[in-house]
Swiss-Prot record:
The protein's name: Structure-specific endonuclease subunit MUS81
Gene3D superfamilies: 3.40.50.10130, Crossover junction endonuclease EME1, DNA-binding domain (1.10.150.670), DNA polymerase beta, N-terminal domain-like (1.10.150.110), Winged helix-like DNA-binding domain superfamily/Winged helix DNA-binding domain (1.10.10.10)
Its EC number(s): 3.1.22.-
Active site: 274, 277, 307
Length: 551
């Protein structure tokens, strides 16, 4: 007699890949809820994001690829994990006790979270036996993500734009346009070697991809020393260095590029015109015609900040298609009066000045060009005059007013000739982004030009407006939308409270509503270190603590 068919579950329920992190986030959420703090919402969002993530995490740093995980929360997880292991914990956050395939080594031997962790490939994985070809797009993607993983100052992920930019430096033939599909990226996603999260997508290595990338790096002789990075060293809480809002870190491209040195006879001064200045209806724009008439050597490019910059271009380069270029320490932003009026109304005026201050160049020129009658504009003449005056007196820009486009072109021609004379006979050298340079030239006026300059690629890459931003940077931009809150004031607030969550926690710790209103009033701002003041402090309190619609 045949045995009866036994119906049952064919697949076991999936085991939680990160039980410790889930448990700790749940505890923190419940504790915040019991105290009535707003941080419970932060922990709840992070918990949901973690529960949807199917792969194991070996440190809090790795959790940064997930949504709602900021620097502070990742540090909290790492500190909690360190305490757990120090108290005799017998497994990592991604290896629940009793789970098959748990690490067999002694519990005391815990690898550094910033170093590659080799894992066994899963059964049935499509990545088993896969080895990307030399100079292929897939190989370069894995290596670039591996470098980012080793970078202690990085995020352990890259966006598609960042991947395209970095891979184009090594294998330009296999890199498509930014709007086109990338077969190599799709193949790695299909093989479960990389993981895509967020929108726009962020790509990071999976454990299988990390193991393969480590083998590729060893095959190419790439190590943490050759990559220009060092593994993260854990020295307790003192190792956490707060980020500065106005001091962007050194880019990977700046680390990898060989130093560029241009001797006096090896370069020429060239004016770079933003492509936005060249748009015309069926004819070449007047600005380019005037520059050609004045015989100003120039080129048209996409500039992410400013309208005109000058570069020292190599005259006898090794690669004629890619000559070395160093950006001289001057930048010009051109505004017609009608454009100035509209930019003040829609908020671009303050944002553009803030980005110009952070572009890495010390001498900033604001070129204001007359256009038609002032009485036909949306703002009164006194408002425009006040804005221009503030730009010179408060922001420290050099303001130049011209009558028309011909006079503007003539001024650019004079600047070009002046820079040629200024740098004549000087040897120019490249410097990485963030190294001392422009700040020194501003602090100590001198007749000698700044000869330690940014490369054009570094300058333009760091000036990208819509690049991936940290919570700190987005918080600062949000603060700057408040009327009366300048970039310097926003930076001062963010230096004290780096995220909205930390600000809300500070509000929760206040005993009375009056104390909450005055919480930010004594924050020191700007070079004169003046207080933020009660009015702005009250406005920010109403913005972040009001449960009803703002009036």
């Amino acid at each position: 007699m045949a045995e009866p068919v036994r119906l049952g579950r064919k697949r076991p329920l999936p085991v939680c890949p990160n039980p410790l992190f889930v448990r700790w986030l749940t505890e923190w959420r419940d504790e915040a809820a019991s105290r009535g703090r707003h941080t419970r919402f932060v922990f709840q969002k992070a918990l949901r994001s973690l529960q949807r993530y199917p792969l194991p995490l070996r440190s809090g740093k790795e959790a940064k690829i997930l949504q709602h995980f900021g620097d502070r929360l990742c540090r909290m997880l790492d500190e909690k994990l360190k305490q757990h292991l120090a108290s005799g914990g017998d497994h990592a956050p991604s290896s629940p006790s009793g789970k098959k395939g748990a690490s067999k080594g002694p519990p005391e031997q815990v690898q550094d979270s910033s170093m590659p962790v080799p894992t066994q490939p899963q059964a049935g994985s499509t990545s088993v036996g896969y080895w990307p070809a030399q100079n292929s797009g897939a190989r370069e993607i894995l290596l670039q993500l591996y470098r980012e993983h080793l970078n202690s100052d990085g995020h352990s992920f890259l966006t598609k734009e960042e991947l395209l930019q970095k891979c184009a430096q090594k294998t330009p033939r296999v890199v498509p346009g930014s709007s086109k599909p990338w077969p190599a990226l799709r193949s790695l996603l299909h093989r479960n070697l990389i993981l895509g999260t967020h929108r726009p997508a962020r790509y990071a290595l999976t454990p299988e991809g990390l193991e393969l990338a480590q083998k590729l790096a060893e095959a190419e002789g790439l190590s943490t020393r050759h990559a220009g990075f060092r593994p993260e060293e854990h020295h307790g809480e003192d190792s956490a260095v707060p980020e500065a809002l106005s001091e962007p870190g050194t880019t990977e491209g700046a680390v990898q590029q060989r130093p560029l040195e241009l001797r006096p006879s090896e370069y020429r001064v060239l004016l770079c015109v933003d492509i936005g200045e060249t748009r015309g209806a069926g004819h070449r724009p007047e600005m380019l015609r005037e520059l050609q008439r004045l015989r100003v050597p120039h080129t048209v490019r996409k500039l992410h900040v400013g309208d005109f910059v000058w570069v020292a271009q190599e005259t006898r380069p090794r690669d004629p298609e890619r000559p070395g270029e160093l950006v001289l320490d001057h930048i010009v932003e051109r505004k017609r009066l009608d454009d100035l009026c509209s930019s003040i109304i829609d908020g671009r005026f303050r944002e553009q000045k803030f980005r110009l201050k952070r572009c890495g160049l010390g001498h900033r020129v604001y070129l204001v060009e007359e256009h038609g009658s002032v009485h036909n504009l949306s703002l009164p003449e006194s408002t425009l005059l006040q804005a221009v005056t503030n730009t010179q007196v408060i922001d420290g820009f050099f303001v130049k007013r011209t009558m028309d486009i011909k006079e503007s072109a003539g001024y650019l021609a004079l600047l070009t000739k002046g820079l040629e004379r200024l740098y004549q006979g000087h040897t120019l050298r490249s410097r990485p982004w963030g190294a001392p340079g422009a700040a020194e030239s501003e602090a100590k006026p001198s007749t000698n030009p700044l000869c330690s300059l940014l490369t054009f690629s570094d300058f333009n890459a760091e000036a990208v407006k819509n690049k991936a931003q940290s919570v700190r940077e987005v918080f600062a931009r949000q603060l700057m939308q408040v009327r009366g809150l300048s970039g310097e004031k926003a930076a001062a607030v963010v230096d004290r409270y780096s995220t909205p969550a930390s600000l809300l926690a500070a509000y929760d710790a206040c005993a009375t509503a009056k104390e909450q209103e005055m919480l930010l009033s004594t924050i020191k701002c700007g070079r004169l270190q003046r207080n933020l003041g009660p009015a702005l402090s009250r406005t920010l309190y109403q913005l972040y603590c009001s449960h009803s619609p703002l009036s």
